Amino acid sequence: MGRVIRAQRKGAGSVFVSHTKKRKGAPKLRSLDYAERHGYIKGVVKDIIHDPGRGAPLAVVHFRDPYKFKTRKELFIAPEGLYTGQFVYCGKKATLEVGNVMPVGAMPEGTIVCNLEEKMGDRGRLARASGNFATVIGHNPDAKRTRVKLPSGAKKVLPSSNRGMVGIVAGGGRIDKPILKAGRAYHKYKVKRNCWPYVRGVAMNPVEHPHGGGNHQHIGKASTVKRGTSAGRKVGLIAARRTGRIRGGKTDTKKET
């Protein structure tokens, strides 16, 4: 009988879970309170820091507590153009400037927004990776809904009361720089999770992977498997509707002409 394959081991967690010990904290918007619902609250950017394992930088923003004589520290995902010492305004009556947090219903059509709430009060769920942004497409004042275009290109209808940060997430173009050597890849994934180096199944022994073994590296059987396949065999193209090249596309048409 073969061994427990890599996919089964990853499903159990253990050494494959994310490394969060050195993370700076969970970057979120402020908790929705009376000040944000009816006016605005002012904060100041104290520092912009690097979060290990995250491509986007984080901004440390200090707010005065509206009810107690104390300062509240918040961690925001830094948009492009934010700087230390900048004043950040959060609330319904905030102005449309980079770094400010306001409801998407108060933003004009075409506004670039990031760290967008999916549900009211969840403190930011969408468009959070480096270089990502969503675009406000249109509003429906009667239904109090706003249509936005997500980084994937999908269009989503959200409540107009959902908050978002104006601007593009900083760190864009990060993946354009080539890694060039294995040492950099090692350090990149060391702070993320145990997923590197990635060994191909055909390069393994038959006891370790269904694609392993043989006098030369080849799968030796159909790589498509059904959805209900047992866990130790469920590798390759899982429940594929079709395989192979997509013929008749733009690239094929250009070659023919």
Curated annotation (Swiss-Prot):
Main subcellular location of this protein, as a coarse class: cytoplasm
Sorted UniProt keywords: Cytoplasm, Ribonucleoprotein, Ribosomal protein, RNA-binding, rRNA-binding
Residue ranges of the region described as Disordered: 210-231
GO cellular component, one term: cytosolic large ribosomal subunit
GO molecular function: rRNA binding; structural constituent of ribosome
A Pfam family this chain is assigned to: Ribosomal_L2
Family matches, as InterPro entries: NA-bd_OB-fold (IPR012340), Rib_uL2_dom2 (IPR014722), Ribosomal_uL2 (IPR002171), Ribosomal_uL2_arc_euk (IPR023672), Ribosomal_uL2_C (IPR022669), Ribosomal_uL2_CS (IPR022671), Ribosomal_uL2_dom3 (IPR014726), Ribosomal_uL2_RNA-bd_dom (IPR022666)
Cited SUPFAM superfamilies: Nucleic acid-binding proteins (SSF50249), Translation proteins SH3-like domain (SSF50104)
SMART domains: Ribosomal_L2 (SM01383), Ribosomal_L2_C (SM01382)
GO BP, one annotated term: cytoplasmic translation
Subcellular location: Cytoplasm
NCBIfam families: PRK09612.1
Protein family according to the UniProt entry: Belongs to the universal ribosomal protein uL2 family.
Alphabetical list of PANTHER family matching this protein: LARGE RIBOSOMAL SUBUNIT PROTEIN UL2 (PTHR13691:SF16), RIBOSOMAL PROTEIN L2 (PTHR13691)
Record-given protein name: Large ribosomal subunit protein uL2
Phylogenetic lineage: Eukaryota, Metazoa, Ecdysozoa, Arthropoda, Hexapoda
